[in-house]
From Swiss-Prot:
Binding-site residues for ATP, renumbered to this chain: G30, N31, N32, A33, Q34, G35, K36, T37
Keywords recorded for this protein, A-Z: ATP-binding, Cytoplasm, DNA damage, DNA repair, DNA replication, DNA-binding, Nucleotide-binding, SOS response
The keyword Nucleotide-binding belongs to this UniProt entry's keyword annotation: yes
Keyword Repressor: no
Chief location bin: cytoplasm
Function: The RecF protein is involved in DNA metabolism; it is required for DNA replication and normal SOS inducibility. RecF binds preferentially to single-stranded, linear DNA. It also seems to bind ATP.
Protein's name according to its UniProt entry: DNA replication and repair protein RecF
Native source species: Streptococcus pyogenes serotype M2 (strain MGAS10270)
Gene Ontology terms describing biological process: DNA replication; DNA synthesis involved in DNA repair; double-strand break repair; SOS response
Amino acid sequence: MWIKELELKHYRNYDHLLASFSSGLNVFIGNNAQGKTNFLEAIYFLSLTRSHRTRADKELIHFDHSTVSLTGKIQRISGTVDLEINLSDKGRVTKINALKQAKLSDYIGTMMVVLFAPEDLQLVKGAPSLRRKFIDIDLGQIKPVYLSELSHYNHVLKQRNSYLKSAQQIDAAFLAVLDEQLAGYGARVMEHRIDFINALEKEANTHHQAISNGLESLSLSYQSSVVFDKKTNIYQQFLHQLEKNHQKDFFRKNTSVGPHRDDLAFYINGMNANFASQGQHRSLILSLKMAEVSLMKALTGDNPILLLDDVMSELDNTRQTKLLETVIKENVQTFITTTSLDHLSQLPEGIRIFHVTKGTVQVDSDIH
């Protein structure tokens, strides 16, 4: 899939913008604080209905206005699709082909994106919540049912935690009802995650071995807070641990086990990647991003759109070459932001260059 056209109204520092793109590489050049990242954020927002930079939707609205409108014309294998998001103080409205979508799980996945931003370099050593978010964003685009089950899980989790905080003593019968619901949704969330990580590991290891010239292997491990011996037993063992932890959870006023506390670990040649060098970290993250692209295509039959936000300068020539070779080979529409073309070691034919200045975008040229 690829974005043919994007229109922004009152988004960040863009009062109004209408732009069309190449189905291949699109490079956005400009000084800092001109709107390059805002532009990629808009594509991300149109795909996932959320920003990767802020939780406050009001920050997305141009200072002179009270509403935001994003529309995009997306070319999929199945045909052209029009996406639209309208944002105001009353909330957000999402539409596909002018039809309002009642649930996020009906909207997300229509346009898949993979974002590679400087903050992704913290994925390995950062907080576990970053790694859970990484899994949830990918799985939500690949499997709409996952978003629905995760939403149900979070709703029951909120109910359970609220009860634990307010209760004067344990009502075992009431907790048992919540435990069964939480274990049911949670087990399915974990099953989806485990299958996804196993598939992602194979793709990521293939890319990592290519980047390291066969010297390094990359493995991933889903770290569950629920102890289980095999995937088919997750529900029963999750439920058992919830029941076992009633007193502990009551004392702590929260739920101590479940997918909301799970993590993801990375290993290079069998060694925890927390102890890897900076160069190895960059190779690992690059391998993951390329694996996201190839796995989404393998599981859905369509390519995602790749957003590279000021990361090319973080990669040496070898890693840049591997990345560009992959997107060209896989025919992935790619958006790159940079302050200078000097940060790109080589540019293939058929790219479109845009100059970004104070919320305006001007097409420079197509290189053939």
